[in-house]
Amino acid sequence: MYKRQILYSDTLHYDTESKVATILGPSVIVSDSGTIHTSRGWYDTVNNTSLLLDQSQVESGEKILIGDSIFYNRDTGMGEVYGNMSLIDTAQHVTLQGEYGYYNEQTGYAFATDSARFLEYSQGDTLFLHADTLQMVTVDSVYREIKAYYGVRFYRIDMQGVCDSMQFNTRDSVLYMYTEPVLWNEQYQLYGDTIAIYMNDSTIEYAHVIQFAFAAQHVDSSYYNQL
């Protein structure tokens, strides 16, 4: 093992020829780049690669990667997850989930598919986003970009929406909804070719409907205002 890498374990088998440690009990692997918590799997101490099972956790800075099976390469920072993936950003208060996905620590790129979900809980209410495929790119310590594809649905107490694809960049705080988007905000419903939602401190400031705009306001049980 490298000087700055330590494996603490309840039970393990270590092959002195292959330099592979088979983990058979609660274990912690500590290095300069982060910490791994696992109870079953193996760790190649020469190539810094591992297979981590049973909802193991890979912690790197403010990110935590969790999954049923994680193929992890510490040198490249790549973690590929099969089953119950969660990528938690403790600084930005967001979580990316799916049945399959991966995360690259060095580029800040994350991908999730198969029941993919994104949760944003930095404010008082949580935003729930679901799509077939989700991508999250961490631009820097402050900004990130979210892309959602196919069957997009999102919900928060002050807004709900559906569309085919969506993009949100926290740098300009604009959420773009593409292909038959529908947005509900309290008693209002918006429809158009594309909807751009301008946010201010995670609340809707205004929405811009681009082409084929339709707006409806629910007045009471019998009346609607339409534009």
Where in this protein do the model-derived segments appear?
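Structural signature for solvent-exposed beta-strand/loop edge elements and short helix-capping sites
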Residues: 3-227
